[in-house]
From Swiss-Prot:
Residues 125-162 are annotated as: LID. Consists of three domains, a large central CORE domain and two small peripheral domains, NMPbind and LID, which undergo movements during catalysis. The LID domain closes over the site of phosphoryl transfer upon ATP binding. Assembling and dissambling the active center during each catalytic cycle provides an effective means to prevent ATP hydrolysis. Some bacteria have evolved a zinc-coordinating structure that stabilizes the LID domain. AMP binds at residues 31, 36, 57-59, 84-87, 91, 159, 170. PANTHER family: NUCLEOTIDE KINASE. InterPro entries: Adenyl_kin_sub, Adenylat/UMP-CMP_kin, Adenylat_kinase_CS, Adenylate_kinase_lid-dom, P-loop_NTPase. It is found in: Cytoplasm. Belongs to the adenylate kinase family. It comes from the Bacteria. This is Adenylate kinase. Residues 30-59 are annotated as: NMP. Pathway: Purine metabolism; AMP biosynthesis via salvage pathway; AMP from ADP: step 1/1. The lineage of its organism: Bacteria, Pseudomonadati, Aquificota, Aquificia, Aquificales. The gene is adk.
Amino acid sequence: MILVLLGPPGSGKGTQGALLKSELSFEHISTGDMLRAEVSKKSPLGLKAEEYMKQGLLVPDDLIIAMIKNILTEAPHKNYVFDGFPRNVNQAEAFETMLNTMRLQVDKVFYFDLEDDVIIKRLSGRRVCPKCGATYNIYYQKPKNDTLCDNDATPLIQRDDDKEEVIVNRLRVYKEQTFPLIEYYKYKNKLFVVSADGTQEEVFEKLKSML
């Protein structure tokens, strides 16, 4: 079975992908992790990808598709969940073409739906300890002292990409890119909408009921 998880930043799709791996033994494929792994092992595809990444450019779709094909070829009978890929209709079409050559297909696509104001709260409320890496949220998971880490009393920081104006822009870009993709999978009768409002356990139960 091949699943695709879609959803805006802060919708928790990465967490749900990790739960599918730990609870149901899916192989969880995040394209960011996959790219970093290929670069670190200096594979031929990784070396090509690194040339683009060093220049701050997006890695071309054909390289990403080739990496995914290598993973699937090694174990075509496993269950896979793709997190954050495809990102647009062009990638979805290239992915589908590649899967067809292997007599595989995307079985279901889950879109994690969440209101913008909840996403902004989830992300802009994040605070991180620069010393130990502990993460808090001033709305949902407060430290004992509002501004200090529970572990080592280091002042907490807000990362630049968690600032509200950055999040609003990320959401705008995400919608522009991804809404056509949602329509693409809806047309193919593969789209399932999951309400991402709730605890990660509650959302996972909803997801499992749709598998």
